[in-house]
Regions:
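N-terminal Sec-pathway targeting helices
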Residues: 1-17
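Membrane-interface motif at the C-terminal end of an N-terminal transmembrane signal
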Residues: 18-37
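Alpha/beta-hydrolase fold active-site loops
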Residues: 44-45, 101
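Structural motif
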Residues: 46, 140-142
Length: 153
């Protein structure tokens, strides 16, 4: 059985095309598996707190201080996130590398009462949550909302 020159060229081009697809596919797969692996294996389980109406990201400072005073071993880190009306976020504090249960407080520039404000804050919180999850790769969390902060979840 002989293969014509035309068939040989077509088979060669198909093979080259498949090899050309395989290389970027392999690279893409490795990158995504690495991201998923990092997310899946995360030991970080933050406590995300949202203060109620008229309260700021400083609302839980006393609570965190008291928790750390009574805690043996690694103390809770405190990261405060302020979400501005334009969706911008500013961070203060940090998460210690050895702390698997840091406290993250999310406060809002628009911290006023009212149903329409709570709906806006809920949308802004979703953006903040996604940014935090992307940055810190946690796959679970504990949530605490004080007063209207509980409605934002």
């Amino acid at each position: 059985m002989t293969i014509s020159k035309k068939t040989a060229i077509v088979l060669t081009l198909v093979c080259l095309f498949l090899i050309g697809l395989a290389i970027p596919s392999y690279s893409w797969t490795r990158t995504n598996v690495s991201k998923i692996e990092k997310f899946y294996n995360s030991k970080l389980s933050p406590i995300i707190m949202i203060p109620g109406s008229s309260a700021t990201e400083n609302r839980f400072d006393g609570l965190v201080t008291k928790l750390n005073k009574e805690r043996q071993g690694t103390k809770h880190s405190l990261l405060k996130v302020k979400v501005w009306n334009d969706g911008r976020m500013t961070y203060s504090g940090s998460i210690d590398a050895k702390d698997n249960e840091p406290v993250i407080v999310v406060g809002f520039e628009n911290n006023k009462d009212g149903y329409s404000n709570i709906k806006k804050q809920a949308k802004l919180f979703n953006q903040a949550f996604e940014a935090l999850q992307e940055k810190y790769n946690f796959n679970n969390f504990k949530g605490l909302g004080h007063s209207n902060g509980g409605l934002i979840y």
